Amino acid sequence: FFKNREITKIDTLLSLTGFSLVGGPAYNSSKEAENALSLLGVPYLAAHAIEFQNLSQWAKSDGGLSPVETTILVALPELDGATNPTVFGGRLGEEGGCSCCSEKRNGKEKSYDMVPCFERVNSLAEKTYNLVKLRKREVADKKVGIILYGFPPNAGAIGTAAYLSVFHSLFNTLKAMK
């Protein structure tokens, strides 16, 4: 559907399902997702509407997403290769949703209705647009910041990570950008 013979017809794949690309909320097949994404060769972004709390509860929460939401809405899509997890909406709730959007509502929504957070939808659209723009920019014109992990500090552990060849990967990345 996203390809015309060998040519990919999309610049980015944006999933709004709130769970794994291949499977569902209770099952995922990261291998099948990896195969599909490899064939497309485009970035994969996953955004989601929160399900287990309403927008107002989420906005007021010190903890953000619940552990179940974090697993289903963030971790499973990331296993597939998704980036940029973003909340774009959720249930309105008795409080009327998020404070940034209450004036934009038509007043006909019920507390249990799923509604967008317009501010976050606009932010998601802007991030997606900028990612597409960045991918189309010449490699030599891209500006890249590199952060290397170093823990414990002052112990000569810069660039260490379990089961990862950090400097080899960094070298290959920089070489590809030359």
Tell where the protein language model's regions lie, with residue ranges.
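An N-terminal assembly and electron-transfer interface module characteristic of large anaerobic redox
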Residues: 1-178
